[in-house]
Amino acid sequence: MNWTGLYTLLSGVNRHSTAIGRVWLSVIFIFRIMVLVVAAESVWGDEKSSFICNTLQPGCNSVCYDHFFPISHVRLWSLQLILVSTPALLVAMHVAHQQHIEKKMLRLEGHGDPIHLEEVKRHKVHISGTLWWTYVISVVFRLLFEAAFMYVFYLLYPGYAMVRLVKCDAYPCPNTVDCFVSRPTEKTVFTVFMLAASGICIILNVAEVVYLIVRACARRAQRRSNPPSRKGSGFGHRLSPEYKQNEINKLLSEQDGSLKDILRRSPGTGAGLAEKSDRCSAC
């Protein structure tokens, strides 16, 4: 599995995340993916071949292994990390869409040179407006995926600890046989570590949702007490209604000025208009 590609995608989201979101990403890649790739995969690498039952009955080992380990720990954690990391891509797509709109506005304003476009790509987008909702929804989905996988893991392996010996009487085993699990202590340590890291991520997600809501409420209260001035720059200002209205007024004034210049340069047309206005006043 190529975890480097996933890290490259999420590192772009990290630039636009909160401080808690950056900590969450560090926990994901340092304490979970690195441990999963470096250590856990080697510990669980021989789980099927080293699962031995004291019987020579063909198929008994495979049936007992499937009964006690319906899904491998490593594969379950890999699926969990992929699904938990996917909602963050919503934020990356939203930011890319906003930057695309800003680049189009710069081109319409005549600032479409590569320097300005590269500056748009580098600057940090503030979490506000529709981006705030996208960010909160992504964090909530991360939280739900983490909690769901914790519950699924509890249903599959209630004790969390890896047992050394299991007794199996499933068909085609001739009777109740003893089956031995390889490296039970190592597997227990890594299981507890991964579950603890998942619990930390759940706490970070809850803290980030609370932080985003509190900060949004504080900003709204600040706007009510101190109305924002019309001056400003940046992406949010360019998309504000005041900015759009000012641009429209500017275009209208330029068109009005050009029309007056045309009337000045055409005396006949100006005289005709003056004559029409005199007739209207006489009427």
Swiss-Prot record:
Membrane topology, as annotated: Multi-pass membrane protein
A molecular-function term among this protein's GO annotations: identical protein binding
Residues on Cytoplasmic side: 1-22, 96-130, 215-283
InterPro entries to which the protein is assigned, alphabetical: Connexin, Connexin32, Connexin_CCC, Connexin_CS, Connexin_N, Connexin_N_sf
Places the protein is found: Cell membrane; Cell junction, Gap junction
Any single GO BP term: cell-cell signaling
Keywords: Cell junction, Cell membrane, Gap junction, Membrane, Phosphoprotein, Transmembrane, Transmembrane helix
Subunit annotation: A connexon is composed of a hexamer of connexins. Interacts with CNST.
Family: Belongs to the connexin family. Beta-type (group I) subfamily.
Described purpose of this protein according to its UniProt entry: One gap junction consists of a cluster of closely packed pairs of transmembrane channels, the connexons, through which materials of low MW diffuse from one cell to a neighboring cell.
Protein name: Gap junction beta-1 protein
Species for this entry: Equus caballus
Annotated gene: GJB1
